[in-house]
Amino acid sequence: LTKDLFVRNTRKGDNEIYILDHFSAPNTLLEIGRLREITFRASGGGTGEKLDIDYFDTHKNCYKQLIVWSPEDEEIIGGYRYLVCAEAQDQDGNYHLSTTHYFEFSTAFKEKYLPSTIELGRSWVQPNYQPTVNPKKGLFALDNIWDGLGALIRFYPSIKYFFGKVTMYPDYDTSSRDFLLFFLQHFFPDSEQLIKAYHPLQIGNTSAYAALIEGKEYKDAFKELNSFVRERGTFIPPLMNIYMNLSATMKTFDTAVNPDFGNVEETGILVTIADIYPDKKERHLD
């Protein structure tokens, strides 16, 4: 990691944020691939290979890697990979993104949204820095990564949207998953029919979940959801929880099963940067 790849210090934890790719730091990418595979495999996903590195990490117009580095431990804590979507469009107007393997984009999405969008993917925090494993070191891990996303907004002032997938794993409680997905579709719908999964996950009867949140405002409905999943010995996935409480205008799309990554279930989401709640902006983005 060299000075030219340094982006900023984190607000908490005295860590550092870097942006790199296959060409600027190939050896660091190998370590990212190793840590990503360990991280995702521990949760029931992963590629099954030694390294989680794919075509999108290494091709000519590869994704950038945003990482958090601990100078004290000399370890990578976690990160995202991202790509400015406008840079992924070919001469025929087609977009070459990792999400296009699983989701079909409408013409409206390609014309109205993608030219001003960054795609985020492969969000990860390595096991040694996860709160459930190491509460002290894991306290600010996700917070630090979001400091990095704040830097992206400064780097790319024309960007209006963050688009990506939020992952749930096959061993996640099925009824909790179904309620969570119903909740997302209820409060954060894709009213413009922008994106559809090629092979959408089918959930069961949702009438019981509808009865629990019918007529309730978001905060009260969220309490119902949170109580429901906790009663079943689980919790709302941390990244999902962050996105749900980021803005009122988030859009939720279909959930696709990813057979190339341990059959994880990936829900498409779109966040409008201008609509992020002020307290979140002050914390990470300004």
Give the location of each predicted region.
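Extended effector regions of multi-domain proteins
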Residues: 231-234, 264-268, 274-278
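Short, flexible loop/turn elements at secondary-structure junctions
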Residues: 21-24, 70-72, 81-87, 122-127, ...
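N-terminal regions that are enriched for targeting/export leaders
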Residues: 1-8
